[in-house]
Amino acid sequence: MQPRKSARSNKGQHSQWSLQDVLRQEQDDDVNSEPRRKKSKVESDSDDVYDDAGEVANASSENDDDDDDDNNNDKNEEDGEVRCTPCGANKDNYDEETDEGGTMIECDKCHTWQHAKCMGYRNERSIPKKYMCNLCQESKSETKKKPEKEQTTPGYSFTLRDKTRISVAKAFFGVFHKNIPPASLPDGIDAVMMATKWAQELEAEVFKVFPSKDKHYTDKSRGLMVLIKKENVMRRISTGELSFYDLVNSSPEEIDEDLKVYAEKVRQESIRRSVLTVDEGSQRIRRTHKGEEIVEDANRQSEEADVNVVPRNIDHRRIKEDSPPREIITNSESQTYYHNEEDDDDDEQAEADGEESNKDDVNEDSSDSDDDELDMILKDKKDENKEEVEVRQQPAKPAPVPAKKPSFEKESAEVWKGEIVFPDFASFSAVAELKSCTNYVEPSDSQTARNFSRFIKVGKELLSRKKHEVEGRLDKNRADDYLNKVVSSRDFYLIEIKPTANHPDYDKLYGYLLDREKVGVLSGKPSFAKDSYLITLEKSRPLPPYLSTLKGFEQSTGLFALYVVRKGYVPAAPSILKNRSSYNVPAPIPPTNSNHHSKPMLPQPPAMAAKPKTPLLDSILSTLGGAQANPVPKPQPIPQQNHQFQQPHFQHQPSGAYNRVPSLPGKPNLPSKPTFGSNASNAPNYNKQHQTSDLNLSGDQMRYLQELVKNNPQQARHEPQALVGMAANSGASFGGSGLPAGDDDDEFPTYN
């Protein structure tokens, strides 16, 4: 009976296991068959090699007795010396049986043995086919580096490695070799050696300035090659007057005097070509890069225009056909001569001056439209025309009159008078003068005078109060750091504070801030000023950095107000209605001889001061009301319901009619102010049908109209209706009474 056999013959075995065993065996055979001079020391613990049967085999190839070549290799390997420098093993202390270093490998060059682990190889597969020990590798690297360091060129040698630097140095060498004066060569040194030395030194200086070797490096090298070719530059280099450092870091004009003279000639020629020239035909020619352009002569235009003007004040009886040519005289006797520069009409003269001032100020700041600056411009125009040039008759071609230089007057630098107070410490009267500011220019003509006037206006706005207090103190170093940071983004105004007399409190405050290194904080700065400080300056000490940028300032000892102002601030132009504060000045005067009424009266606004009406006021009231001015209306009792007033329309009324004054936009029409004690006999008689339409004018409205007429007499005399538009446009300035703003409709709020 045969033993039972399982249907699964490969039960418990992997189907591919035998194939993997074969592949592993072939790989091991290939590894063992590689010709390698290696010495494997087998240790029973760590370096055992197992064969396919699982038995331990010695790495010294004792099982390969049949191979004669392997025996010969083992014999040669035993002959090499052991020299493992990392662990210190050598032929004296090395014992193959007790060595724990593991596998040893032989150097293919010196045939010495080292531990594979000491040489950095973790296993046998990482060992290269051609192995060299650490000592042999160092000697090999040194021999390879030596030829790379030196790059010889016939005639001279350089130790540079970069191709760009070598090419630049060679170019310098060529220029030096050709241009070195033989007399400047020292004994024992020829031109080749000197040129080589100079070329290397010059290239090194260029490389220090431009280490990136970019376009600037090459451009600078080319420029230096042109310079060192010049005889005077080469002479200065050979004598030691010009060093290579100065040669690289100086401009060509500073090195070569001839080039400096040539550059100056080029600049002068450029300036000459840019200036307008006048040819013989009185044509102005502008020379530009596009060529010559003929510009129409403005003087010729003005002369032709003067010829065509028909004079209105010429005495035609003096003109004769055979009259002599005109002669230029000074206007001192007759007023019948033709006025060539001014017209006798005041209105036309003012209009012409206004047009000229507008043309002059097209490119100026908006502040040039201020009244004071306009007065200065008009004053300059009048100063130019003080000596009037007149002609007896009008020739065919008038002769040109030489123009006078415009004159100007420097405005006073004083911007303030008042009192400086340090609470509970010091108080003194002082004046303030503008010393300097950002973009400050000392007045030298009409333009700079206008700018100076603008600076003075800003200074007056900064110190607008009569009394300024020192609100606080700040450490000077901290303030200096802050001011140094904002000096480029803000405008600075430096104003000197001087006492009106020898005041001890001034010296007391100055000594306190100076000794303790403090900065005072001034009160009352306007909205356009960010900071206001009271600082101390001493002539013997250097200026702070933020003040060194201010021009026109000579350092002195004393107290100074420093304002940090918004960049480019320009003072606003004044309104056509000046002195607005005067509308609030009149104080109420209690009425006298009041009439007693049984009914309660309306609450009245403050009474107007007794002030006689002027004819101008009567004129405008007549225009506004449509009739003659009415005396102050009679008192009215309180009605049962709230009064609502309708805004009247402007229209012509028949003589004797008296209409209510139209209310201004944005202001209510208040009930009329009662006046007590007025005699009925003194009041004019009116028709009964017009008694109900008395003038309704409050005290504030009356004061406003009086100031309006006072400040604008021309409009009140000739165009009273224009004052209504002025009052409408400046409704915010209506007396400052704090009344509620009216609606845009015809109905106004009820006065309770």
Curated annotation (Swiss-Prot):
A zinc finger (PHD-type) spans 81-139. Coiled coil: none annotated. Residues 45-54, 62-80, 341-355, 362-375, 742-752 have a biased composition (Acidic residues). Transmembrane segments: none annotated. GO terms for cellular component: nucleus. Keywords: Metal-binding, Nucleus, Repressor, Transcription, Transcription regulation, Zinc, Zinc-finger. Residues 160-283 form the TFIIS central domain. Residues 639-654 have a biased composition (Low complexity). SMART domains: PHD, TFS2M. GO terms for molecular function: RNA polymerase II complex recruiting activity; RNA polymerase II transcription regulatory region sequence-specific DNA binding; zinc ion binding. It is found in: Nucleus. Residues 290-303, 313-325, 376-391 have a biased composition (Basic and acidic residues). The keyword Metal-binding applies. One of its GO terms (biological process) is transcription elongation by RNA polymerase II. Residues 9-19, 329-338, 675-693 have a biased composition (Polar residues). Residues 1-99, 289-408, 625-693, 710-752 are annotated as: Disordered. The keyword Amino-acid biosynthesis does not apply. Negative regulator of transcription elongation. Belongs to the BYE1 family. This is Transcription factor BYE1. It comes from Meyerozyma guilliermondii (strain ATCC 6260 / CBS 566 / DSM 6381 / JCM 1539 / NBRC 10279 / NRRL Y-324) (Yeast). The lineage of its organism: Eukaryota, Fungi, Dikarya, Ascomycota, Saccharomycotina.
